Amino acid sequence: LRSFDNDLRSAVQDGMIHHGVEIINNTEDVSIAKTDTGVAVTVNSKDGKSVILADVVSLAALGRKPNTANLGLENVDVKTHNGAILVNADSQTSVENIYSVGDCTDNIQLTPVAINEGRAFADTMFGNKPRTMNYADIPTAIFTTPEAATVGLTEEEAREMHGDAVKVYRSSFRPMYYVLPNKQEKTLMKLVVDPTTNRVVGAHMVGDHAAEIIQGVAIAVKMGATKADF
């Protein structure tokens, strides 16, 4: 979660640990060896300790890249970067009559983004309603346990853009749903605010249904809502 807000990352980590997930930080390398029963995954930490995480099965989540290797793009001079097709604001590639949208490009890899890119292309080329895709303030969800979601700038990004006077509002609480059964589940809400206009430039949440809740928050952020509006 390197590109996400630090408070969101910490809250996700704390929640996962609370749910029994072991997280080992500051590791130097991971080795995987075949055994009689499956595979052994060993993590070597910076302090010289080795920990065997699994001795039966291993799942490696190493990211993904566009599946463009066999499309013959090099034969028509379509430019790529690390397999991703390079496009301009109109989804046009380096070849004038070839366009590309979705996860095969170098833009944000989210399903709603790909759908809207396709609609923008269709409106421009065939609907006489030219428009470009707006990549600002796109809500994003992480389906961890606990669930997390975000829209707009992280606190760090906001400070780079607006200086250290950026206002940050946090609230960590136990939802009413968990009070009666006395479960220790926490929800984090965080707003990042432009100090000059009081406009909310970033919103971050960790907790139940964060992915759905952030959709409504994103509308407010896109419309320029201020802290007072919240």
Predicted regions and their residues:
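Conserved beta-strand segments of alpha/beta enzyme cores
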Residues: E22, K79, D164-K167
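Flexible, glycine-rich terminal cap/loop adjacent to redox cofactors
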Residues: F126-G127, F143-T154, R159-F230
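FAD-site-proximal beta/loop scaffold in flavoenzymes
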Residues: I52-G127
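Conserved N-terminal phosphate-binding loop of PLP-dependent enzymes in the Aspartate aminotransferase
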Residues: G20, L86, L191-V193
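Rossmann-like dinucleotide-binding cores of NAD(P)H-dependent redox enzymes
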Residues: L1-N44, G48-K49, N107-I115, D123-E157
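Short, surface-exposed charged micro-motifs
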Residues: S31, D77, D90, K190-V192
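Short, acidic, Ser/Thr-enriched surface-loop or helix-capping motifs
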Residues: S45, N88-A89, D194-P195
